[in-house]
Amino acid sequence: NCLVIGADTIVVLDGKILGKPSDEADARAMLASLSGRTHQVYTGVALFSVKEGIIEKKTTFHECTDVTMVSMTEKEIADYVASGDPMDKAGAYGIQGLAAIFISEIKGDYYNVVGLPISRVYHEIEQF
């Protein structure tokens, strides 16, 4: 018997999904578009209860957090991209790393922006 948890996170700006950047130019473009603006971070989560290889129960949910970034200079963006940090992250930034200096406000769950809304996951499992 086991519980399977799957999750993925996206960044949304003006209705457009920003996934992981394809290259450094894409990362710079994403960060420039986020600079000085508020965007949303969504994490979709699926929970599956499996017994003897059969799914017994399942539920899905999502969490949304509003994130506002300060205005960034081209040099700040270039230096951050050169660090390699944004290349494997939706929206080309990781709030838990170097990009923290670019965040001016968060409305919602910080851990959702990191990639897993852990409090919500815990409470969903408790009700599962």
Model-derived features: positions:
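Anionic-ligand binding patches
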Residues: 1-128
